Amino acid sequence: MASSNRGNARPLKSFLHELYLKHYPEVGDVVHLLNTIGVDCDLPPSHPLLTAQRGLFLARVLQAVQQHKLLEDTIVPKILKKLAYFLELLSYYSPKDEQRDIAEVLDHLKTNRDLGLDDRLWALIRKLRQDRHHASVNVLMPGSDYTAVSLQYYDGISIGMRKVIADVCRSGYASMPSMTATHNLSHQLLMASGPSEEPCAWRGFFNQVLLWTVALCKFRRCIYYNYIQGSIATISQLLHLEIKALCSWIISQDGMRLFQHSRPLLTLWESVAANQEVTDAITLPDCAEYIDLLKHTKHVLENCSAMQYK
């Protein structure tokens, strides 16, 4: 058949491989990659093979985001455990007056969990930072730009590390780092904060409390406003469009002729055509089924000669 889309496969695979670092991706990035499918081959954008490739890419992205959605109930409890752990370590390396302040926050965490915890954490961070660095920037926290605010409080890290933090923890609702990305950043930040001896140990654990405070604020906001559902809905709609286009071609005369020796696959597409619903978000089980269907369909299309599309 006509030349395939091997040239731009690597960016697609790289994006899919790195999806575990995003709680949900920026839809603009998904659309950009979607539009690169087929640019390096001589097939028209409406060709069924390219439609199948776009559909398969979207289905895989959607599957990853849906899986992250299922984990949302576990995120805040995990962050609270991290905060309790690092607050206790920070207290161990702190003087008596700071230990009292930290103990109050720990007591609040144990009795009230995350209710009102973010305000107490920011107050503690601000006090500890200013007690040790009297010339610290004195800026009130503006709304939800937690990442920008946190960058003025990190202690003893390089400009390069601050840039890494800013890149991973980008503010806004267009995308969101995953818990895996936050764990990776936590380890990187701990290594960048210096050796484990005092006073570097205090600095390292202070920076960890700050990072997980930012994570708590960002994830609580993300979950409360259900930002991930917007990503799921948009990607679902894009996938519906590709499936609808591919379905129309497969049940046409040309498609029927090409798939005449793949009757089980054709039957599945006829079922999709009969039950096509383009308004609802695609569920995780349906997404897995679409991936299997699109993979088999793509395989058939890749092994057809160009003449068979005529």
Swiss-Prot record:
The keyword Transcription applies. GO terms for biological process: release from viral latency. Keywords: Early protein, Transcription, Transcription regulation. Enhances the ability of BRLF1 to induce lytic infection by cooperating with it to transcriptionally activate the BZLF1 promoter. Belongs to the lymphocryptovirus BBRF1 family. This is Transcriptional activator BRRF1.
